[in-house]
Design a protein with these regions (language model features):
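Unchanged
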Residues: 1-250, 362
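Left-handed beta-helix
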Residues: 1-7, 196, 205-375
Length: 375
């Protein structure tokens, strides 16, 4: 198999976290990034050629995290990843040029009989070998992966699948859904398709002048084809806004969720950093929390996730918070129900307090010298 990995999803509701990075490189559970999950699913299925698309101006954190791609087996002689900018394809379309030429060239050169299409907005750990097996048995051109969830977990433009008595599938956007059921089949924007069929489909869409997004076209047009489906039953989070992102991290403090997502038979790979272990002073007090390596903890930490290289100094209190890489909570500061982005500093005695429904977000690199209390 080869893969097309789309990372162009965006949401104003995730700002300011996405002011400096794409959704794909949002931090998760102390040491991971969201893109680690689709890349790990691909790696575990021995997919060694990956075509990635990102938005213009959002690739710095991507290259910093991916490096050579070695952690996901993408640094070999015949194993590699390619990064393209979505807006370049949009401009080619505006100029009347062949805007899917790079995609078609990639698919033809891969010589892979099957192609995986996926994104990085959904946090899940899918066994693509199992999906491929079902795809082959079904004998259809397309297999899509879904999870049954409460409609409240779907964003307005997420795709909901419906099945009639004969198993034929139809689909619509969440905001078009009539009479929502207790559980709906949420499309995880993950497909396995026959590569020859995909090449013909892309060529047809290009000739018709359709939008320059294969993932969008496939979701919009799959009702016109005989599509097979695969139900994913593992852990899943849908990242749509600050609240959903905060909750997705916080539920990792529950052992069942942590084990299901990160320590199943499908390992999750991430960028390796050889750092010293975290230091806990004799006065520190840590309860029900997770911490990355290289931290210094002298204060109190409760129900929180502290990323690599962060500091919680003497007298500081951190509760129900996400502290990103290399941030510092100084002496006697209080941080509750908050997300402290990378390299931020909370000065001595400052209080950062939000609520579980609306956590306070401190932007990357901020130095906070005054209280921020939003109750």
């Amino acid at each position: 198999m080869c893969a097309l990995l789309s990372n162009v999803s965006s949401s104003q509701a995730l700002r300011p976290l996405t002011d400096v990075r794409p959704i794909a490189t949002l931090p998760f559970d102390c040491k991971y990034r969201l893109i680690d999950f689709p890349l790990s699913s691909l790696s575990n299925a021995h997919v060694d050629n990956v075509f990635m698309t990102f938005n213009e101006g959002e690739t710095q954190s991507v290259f910093d995290h991916l490096g050579s791609g070695s952690e996901w087996g993408l640094d070999g002689f015949n194993s590699r990843y390619f990064v393209y900018i979505q807006q370049d394809f949009d401009r080619l379309k505006e100029q009347g040029k062949a805007y899917f030429a790079q995609h078609l060239n990639f698919l033809k050169k891969s010589k892979a009989p099957y192609t995986v299409l996926l994104g990085s907005k959904f946090i899940c750990n899918v066994d693509l070998n199992a999906v491929l097996k079902i795809h082959k048995l079904a004998g259809k051109e397309i297999t899509t992966v879904y999870k049954k969830v409460s409609p409240t977990l779907a964003a307005e433009y997420d795709t909901i699948l419906r099945f009639d008595e004969e198993g034929k599938m139809s689909n619509c956007y969440m905001n078009q859904l009539e009479n929502p059921q207790e559980k709906e089949a949420l499309c995880l924007n993950l497909f396995i398709v026959n590569t020859d069929w995909l090449i013909d489909f892309i060529q047809e869409m290009q000739n018709a002048g359709e939008i320059a997004s294969i993932a969008h076209l496939l979701r919009a047009r799959m009702k016109d084809y005989d599509v097979n489906s695969y139900e994913y039953t593992g852990y899943m989070s849908n990242i749509t806004d600050i609240k959903s992102f905060y909750d997705a991290n916080m539920v990792m403090l529950e052992p069942q969720n942590f084990t299901s997502l990160l320590y199943s038979s499908q390992p999750v790979h991430t960028k390796i950093k050889n750092e010293v272990p975290t230091y806990f002073s004799k006065d520190s007090n840590v309860v029900n929390s997770q911490l990355g390596s290289g931290c210094i903890i002298e204060g109190e930490v409760k129900d929180s996730l502290i990323s690599r290289g962060s500091k919680v100094l003497k007298g500081a209190q951190v509760e129900s918070a996400l502290i990103f890489t290399s941030s510092k909570v100084k002496n006697d500061a209080v941080v509750k129900y908050a997300i402290i982005d990378k390299n931020a500093v909370i000065e001595n005695g400052v209080q950062i307090i939000g609520t579980a429904e609306k956590p306070v977000v401190i932007p990357k690199g901020s130095v906070v010298t005054e209280d921020v209390i939003e109750l």
